[in-house]
């Protein structure tokens, strides 16, 4: 690199928009301005000039931001001067390794010296969201600017890899570094099935001080009313014998002839005694849990819910195994009346203030009593005891009796 080359480079830089800004910078090796070094032809070789040229441009780039005009003017000037210097250097020295690039004097093309290491080209902001990793658009900065984009405390900067080529499939890509988010695996424990919840039953009423005479339940909203409630504790013996399988050694005609001797209303529970005992234990345990929950005002526990499901499944199993329909084991005298805690009042209803007899009936009865007294005096000569003149129905209740 001679003095003529230095003067040509000086004239080209000074004609650029940001030339004076670069020439007056002192970020060189000897702490002199770049203009002074070019005028005095300090640089004997192109690598010496390129080293100071890069340091000066990096220093100025870090003094500005991408939104400033001088930031991009210096970036364009650095690229053009670096390209011109590289071409001049290739003409003089032929082939020379420079900054990791191999320059060919014939076609003046640059290729990467080491393709194994990924070359970072840009940066972006990265954050983890509810739907997976989120990336911002690439930051438009100069290659000389080593500052990372600032995302504050929300996002962090991340370097972006170049687009992978078809020939080299071993390069790291963004998909390999940050795979897409997958759905959360399902829970191993299955929650309670709402379809097994108990059906709406009878609603009990609170009438306050009138609980002794007012209705205590309302079955209009229940799925299974009182009249359709059936028991699976027993079944008709005749229906069981008709549907039961008969061994070949037994005469079927004898059984068929004796079916009429069985009492149609007879009941039996021997074959399902074990299931009934288990059902009774579950019902007792369920009643104990319900009483504890009602007295302590707690929410429905999982144990109580599971026991109710077991009771429901056991009842369905009994009905299915013995092929019973609701009409088969209907009990007419079965009641669903349950004990309900409420206000208790001692005493009786007040007496009726007015007798139930009409005045004409009362007058007729008085006259008959007087006639009886006169007959008794004429026969015995003395007054015999007789009933008082009190209406017979004066102590009857005026309200309807409770049942």
Curated annotation (Swiss-Prot):
This is Chromatin structure-remodeling complex subunit rsc58. The keyword Cytoplasm applies. It is found in: Cytoplasm; Nucleus. Component of the chromatin structure remodeling complex (RSC), which is involved in transcription regulation and nucleosome positioning. Controls particularly membrane and organelle development genes. Residues 376-403 are annotated as: Disordered. Coiled coil: none annotated. It comes from the Eukaryota. Keywords: Chromatin regulator, Cytoplasm, Nucleus, Phosphoprotein, Transcription, Transcription regulation. Signal peptide: none annotated. Its main location: cytoplasm. Residues 376-389 have a biased composition (Low complexity). The modification Phosphoserine is found at residue 384. Component of the RSC complex composed of at least arp9, arp42, rsc1, rsc4, rsc7, rsc9, rsc58, sfh1, snf21, ssr1, ssr2, ssr3 and ssr4. The complex interacts with histone and histone variant components of centromeric chromatin. The keyword rRNA-binding does not apply. The lineage of its organism: Eukaryota, Fungi, Dikarya, Ascomycota, Taphrinomycotina. GO terms for biological process: chromatin remodeling; regulation of transcription by RNA polymerase II; transcription initiation-coupled chromatin remodeling. GO terms for cellular component: chromatin; cytosol; nucleus; RSC-type complex.
């Amino acid at each position: 690199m001679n003095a003529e080359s230095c003067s040509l480079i000086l004239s080209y830089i000074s004609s650029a928009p940001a030339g004076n800004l670069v020439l007056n910078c002192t970020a060189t090796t000897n702490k002199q301005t770049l203009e002074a070094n070019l005028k005095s032809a300090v640089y004997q070789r192109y690598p010496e000039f390129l080293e100071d040229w890069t340091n000066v441009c990096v220093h100025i780039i870090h003094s500005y931001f991408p939104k400033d005009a001088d930031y991009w003017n210096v970036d364009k000037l650095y690229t053009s001067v670096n390209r011109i210097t590289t071409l001049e250097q290739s003409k003089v020295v032929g082939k020379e390794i420079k900054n990791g690039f191999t320059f060919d004097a014939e076609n003046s093309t640059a290729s990467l010296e080491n393709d194994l290491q990924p070359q970072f080209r840009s940066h972006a902001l990265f954050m983890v969201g509810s739907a997976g990793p989120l990336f911002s658009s690439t930051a438009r900065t100069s290659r000389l600017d080593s500052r990372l984009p600032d995302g504050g405390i929300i996002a962090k900067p991340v370097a972006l890899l170049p687009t992978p080529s078809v020939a080299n499939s071993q390069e790291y890509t963004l998909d390999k570094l940050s795979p897409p988010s997958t759905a959360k695996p399902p829970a191993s424990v299955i929650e309670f099935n709402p379809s097994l919840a108990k059906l709406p039953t009878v609603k009990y009423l609170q009438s306050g001080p009138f609980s002794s005479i007012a209705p205590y339940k309302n079955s209009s909203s229940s799925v299974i009313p009182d009249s359709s409630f059936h028991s699976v504790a027993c079944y008709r013996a005749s229906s069981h014998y008709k549907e039961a399988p008969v061994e070949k050694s037994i005469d079927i005609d004898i059984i068929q002839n004796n079916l009429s001797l069985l009492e149609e209303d007879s009941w039996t529970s021997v074959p399902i005694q074990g299931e009934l005992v288990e059902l009774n234990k579950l019902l007792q345990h369920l009643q104990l849990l319900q009483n504890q929950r009602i007295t302590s005002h707690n929410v429905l526990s999982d144990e109580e819910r599971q026991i109710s499901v077991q009771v429901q499944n056991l009842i369905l199993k009994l009905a299915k195994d013995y092929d019973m329909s609701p009409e088969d084991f209907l009990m007419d005298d079965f009641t669903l009346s349950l004990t309900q805690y409420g206000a208790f009042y001692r005493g009786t209803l007040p007496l009726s203030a007015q007798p139930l007899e009409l005045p004409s009936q009362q007058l007729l009865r008085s006259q008959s009593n007087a006639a009886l007294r006169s007959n008794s005096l004429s026969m015995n000569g003395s007054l015999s005891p007789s009933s008082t003149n009190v209406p017979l129905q004066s102590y009857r209740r005026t309200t309807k009796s409770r049942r």
